[in-house]
Amino acid sequence: MAKITIPIRLLKLDDGFHLLVNIRVNGKRARLLIDTGASQTVFDKERIKNFLSKEKFEKHNKLSTGLGTSNMKSHLAVIKNISLGKIEIKNYKTVVIDLSHVNVAYSHMKQKPIDGVLGSDILRKYKAVIDYGKKKLIIR
């Protein structure tokens, strides 16, 4: 497979920065935070409604941790199609959690909300490399 290059945006923070990437979820544009420390890709419980209906969720018996919060309730959803550039991920089973704390912080910074977090499950599977200098996510 040839390399696929996807532009990323560096959002400057007081104490560092966040990496943001635009992908497609079921054909619609989605804005995700790239988090190499996140074990899996997750979507916000409110924002995912832009991509699929709530009846597509099922309760997840496991509590999720991370993203600067304590344990949180989660749901599972199946996304028919995630597009990372030319890569198509079909029937992706994802965790849906409350990311409102991230979006409230983004709102205070006058930034658009994120739809989810692109985690290391997808990054690793597709051998992703982040080129900070060129502001690119490279999929091999």
Predicted regions span which residues?
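Pepsin/retropepsin-fold aspartyl endopeptidases
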Residues: M1-R140
